[in-house]
């Protein structure tokens, strides 16, 4: 029996050694896997942190850029409001010309135009100074310049602040105060901006 016990004892011992080897190998494999997982986790963590950093940096830059754009647009809007007020004030001053200044402006404007002298003059619905006598004076001066001198006041009235529109065969020359200011706008805007905002 002692031989049987020795054999059994040896089998048990061999089994325990094999089990220990298998367990040690399993433990090393587990550590290897854990190390790989840890390294992969660290790599993923680094990538996530880097991505978050880049996204936050880009977001910050977008916010700053949008802020600059917003401020610039507000400045432009404010400048445009001031410019619009300047034009409105200019229009108001033209509309408040006294009778003599206004009629001289109308006469000088018509006489300076390259026209035939037989156009129809369309006036503002609020016109208070231009009448037949005014047109007769203008016609006399047109004749003295070799033109027809047959301008007539139109029955049509339009909605504008002052000035006039000359019409012949459907072609109009717009000399209203609004049109004059608008035509000068491109030339005057840089001057106004320099004067007001420099």
UniProtKB/Swiss-Prot annotation:
Transport as UniProt keyword: yes
SUPFAM superfamilies attached to this UniProt entry: V-type ATPase subunit E-like (SSF160527)
Protein's UniProt keywords contain Lyase: no
Alphabetical keyword list: ATP synthesis, Hydrogen ion transport, Ion transport, Transport
Pfam family, one: vATP-synt_E
InterPro entries cross-referenced by the UniProt entry: ATPase_E_C, ATPase_V1_Esu
Purpose of the protein: Produces ATP from ADP in the presence of a proton gradient across the membrane.
Family: Belongs to the V-ATPase E subunit family.
Protein name (database record): V-type ATP synthase subunit E 1
Source organism of this protein record: Clostridium tetani (strain Massachusetts / E88)
Gene name of the encoded protein: atpE1
């Amino acid at each position: 029996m002692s031989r049987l016990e020795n054999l059994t004892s040896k089998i048990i011992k061999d089994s325990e050694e094999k089990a220990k080897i298998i367990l040690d190998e399993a433990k090393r494999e587990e550590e290897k896997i854990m190390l790989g997982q840890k390294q992969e986790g660290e790599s993923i963590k680094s990538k996530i942190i880097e991505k978050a950093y880049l996204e936050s940096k880009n977001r910050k830059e977008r916010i700053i850029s949008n802020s600059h754009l917003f401020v610039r647009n507000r400045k432009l809007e404010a400048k445009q409001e001031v410019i619009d007020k300047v034009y409105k004030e200019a229009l108001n001053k033209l509309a408040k010309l006294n009778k003599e200044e206004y009629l001289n402006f109308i006469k000088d404007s018509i006489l300076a135009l390259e026209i035939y002298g037989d156009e129809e003059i369309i006036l503002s619905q609020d016109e208070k100074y231009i009448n037949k006598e005014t047109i007769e004076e203008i016609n006399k001066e047109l004749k003295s310049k070799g033109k027809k001198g047959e301008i007539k006041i139109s029955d049509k009235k339009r909605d504008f602040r002052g000035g006039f529109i000359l019409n012949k065969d459907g072609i109009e020359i717009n000399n209203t105060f609004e049109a004059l200011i608008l035509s000068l706008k491109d030339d005057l805007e840089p001057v106004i901006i320099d004067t007001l905002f420099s």
